[in-house]
């Protein structure tokens, strides 16, 4: 292929005009798989668009999206996959610079908002067809999705952080579940009681009682920091193995749950930031962890089990276990 390239360009230099030589070299370099690979490795949609559309006047991601209106059917067909990636890339970059994107970034951080923007654009961006027709319409629709996410995250944050100034040892927060409601066989060991409570409260089928009991025993004494997101992720992976999905999108149909990406970002900031900057009593830590995990819903599955597991571990580390009643649970996590 390289030899044919030099043979062809050599002939053009000998026999062709300067314009035809330049055009042929440009085509040889950029209109092949190697050229495509180069474009896909560029640092931005603008650089990618300039190379693909051969237009140095493209200065912003919006310029790139507007350039799609000029594409002919031949170009769309011959570069379908690359154009799809470019459209999504440009839309993602536009979304990050909107007011909605900036508000979300302030809540969950740069990496999380970028990850969420990529997912939202894949779900709602409309790809090449939308970019050709009217990309502004799709951008506005996706901003509405971001705005809903911000609203849900802020509502959860107000409730969960508000618990730090609440006495969790009185009223509904102190309501316990009657022993016979979850401890069917009458075990007396606190680890086994905690395992029975977790299993009884879970809606998931096939909970592994042996695994839950083993994790409770291990974490009750291993001293691992429960205000560390990596430690929580490790525990969750062992508690809820074989999770089938890796993403839950923003709720736009009337519910209040945030996306899994937004929820994870908020949970990380809550345990590694808020709770460390606003330390709570050891006897209350389990309730705060329970509220944060379930209220922010940062995992795609098993948030209830994880929240109860952390509550139980915190209790066991204090040589006790007081099973929460449903009213107490609902008041702690605040999900409507």
Question: What residue ranges belong to the model's regions?
Answer:
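FIC/Doc superfamily catalytic core
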Residues: 10, 38, 42-45, 49-50, ...
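Hydrophobic, membrane-inserting alpha-helical segments
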Residues: 1-4
């Amino acid at each position: 292929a390289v030899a044919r390239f030099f043979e062809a360009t050599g002939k053009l230099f000998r026999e062709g005009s300067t314009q035809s030589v330049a055009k042929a070299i440009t085509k040889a370099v950029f209109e092949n798989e190697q050229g495509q690979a180069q474009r896909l490795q560029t640092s931005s949609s603008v650089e990618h668009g300039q190379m693909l559309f051969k237009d140095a006047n493209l200065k912003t991601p919006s310029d790139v999206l507007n350039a799609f209106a000029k594409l002919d059917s031949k170009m769309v067909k011959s570069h379908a996959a690359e154009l799809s990636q470019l459209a999504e890339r440009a839309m993602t970059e536009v979304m990050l610079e909107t007011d909605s994107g900036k508000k979300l970034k302030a809540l969950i951080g740069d990496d999380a908002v970028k990850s969420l923007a990529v997912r939202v654009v894949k779900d709602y961006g409309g790809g090449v067809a939308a970019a050709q027709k009217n990309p502004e319409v799709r951008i506005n629709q996706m901003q509405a999705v971001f705005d809903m996410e911000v609203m849900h995250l802020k509502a959860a944050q107000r409730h969960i952080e508000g618990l730090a100034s609440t006495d969790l040892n009185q009223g509904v927060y102190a309501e316990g579940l009657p022993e016979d409601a979850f401890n069917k066989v009458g075990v007396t060991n606190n680890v086994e009681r905690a395992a029975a409570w977790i299993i009884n409260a879970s809606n998931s089928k096939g909970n592994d009682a042996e695994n839950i009991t083993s994790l409770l025993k291990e974490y009750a004494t291993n001293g691992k920091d429960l205000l560390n997101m990596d430690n929580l992720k490790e525990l969750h992976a062992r508690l809820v193995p074989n999770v089938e999905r890796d993403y839950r999108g923003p709720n736009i149909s009337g519910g209040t749950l945030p996306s899994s990406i937004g929820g994870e970002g908020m949970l990380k900031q809550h345990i590694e930031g808020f709770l460390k900057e606003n330390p709570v009593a050891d006897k209350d830590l389990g309730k705060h962890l329970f509220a944060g995990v379930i209220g922010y819903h940062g995992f795609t599955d098993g948030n209830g089990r994880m929240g109860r597991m952390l509550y139980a571990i915190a209790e066991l580390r204090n040589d006790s276990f007081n099973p929460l009643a449903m009213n107490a649970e609902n008041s702690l996590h605040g999900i409507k």
